[in-house]
Amino acid sequence: VVSWMAIIAGYVQHGQPEEALYCFHIMQLDDGVSPDAITFVYALKSCANIKDICKGRELHNQIKRNSLQHDLLVCTGLVDMYAKCGFLAKAKEVFDEIHTQDVVLWTSLIEGYLEHGYYEEVLDSFNRMQLEGVSLDTFTFMCGLKSCGNMATAKQGLQIHARIQCKGFLEVDPIIGNVLVDMYAKCGQVMNMAERAFDSLPSRDVISWTTLIGGYVDQRCSKEAIKCFEQMQLEGILPNHVTFMYILKACENTWVIRKGQKVHAQIEGMGLSERKPFIGNVLIDMYAKSGLLARSREVFENLHVRDVVSWTTLIIGYYEYGDDEEALNCFNAMQMEGVSPNTHTMVCILRTCGSMVDLGKGLEIHTHMEKKGWLDNDVAVGTALLDMFLKCGLLPEAHNIFSTLH
């Protein structure tokens, strides 16, 4: 079993979970080897990685038959598997059956809650861990901070921050400092608490700077974001593609477009546009929002790959600056190139038709949407269609759409 376990572990560690599960099957079928606790753990990890709940349940039943359901390592693997597959009630059920709950078991449950957006459950579990005297590690603290950020609960985030400082984790793990800055920024505290947390970091890497810049941008503090971007480079920190994405968003106003153009030149100099195609979409958006539609179109034409986001960003730019005809031309060209529209594309084009009172094109799009089932699945598209019919004076059709929406 040791040899088989080593092979299975190797596959798991090198990101090949299907091969690991195949070996687990062959080990028993051909060689008649019964898996031990560690082998089960690797098999469960494979199921978690590919979210194969059916195989995971089979393993759970086999674990019970082998009387390993009370083994702490195996149970941690089960909790992790169920949590990653989205079966959080089952993960909690397995968790509650264990008498000795260590930090690893708790963290498996908490990580599952966090991944699936159960932020209150993360914080409840975090508090319960402390009440039960379980020693928290840096990862558990980070899960707590991320939940506070996503729920915008700065008060509890401040309490977690105090505990992190007491344990001295900021000095030993730079990642937790970045998560701390992000938490305060998401709570809307970027101009005070996020800045203070950032300034107190023992060392600041590109992620630290980018997190603070992102916080400024999200709070519409463009001047502060640009100042921070310039300072990080003065300190010898090279921006990454995420930093550039944020700073381009900060330059989406006419008063800072010159800075945006300089950043664009810097991006081209680093060859980032080719390596990170989404940067091109952000550039299209920046120029469009600054009213430089010719420049926006130029960036668009130079893209090696034009996806639905590229097309939609350009279409929205034309619509917002009143060039309805060009917005429709782009929409037609997009379809000619075989790019399928998304919700944002359809909403914008319907608004364009309403603005132009172009009933013919609007009805054509309506027919297309009915065939694709858009009206059944998307309230935003239905609402835009309703608005278009009203602007075109088609009250019976508008009433029918209204009835469908409600």
Regions found by a protein language model. Give the residues of each.
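Alpha-helical solenoid repeat scaffolds, predominantly canonical TPR units
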Residues: S3, C23, L59, V94, ...
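Pentatricopeptide repeat
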Residues: W4-M5, A9, A20, D36-V41, ...
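Inter-helix linker motif
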Residues: D31-G32, S67, I98, D102, ...
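Long hydrophobic segments that form regular secondary structure
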Residues: E97, A197-R204, S208, G214, ...
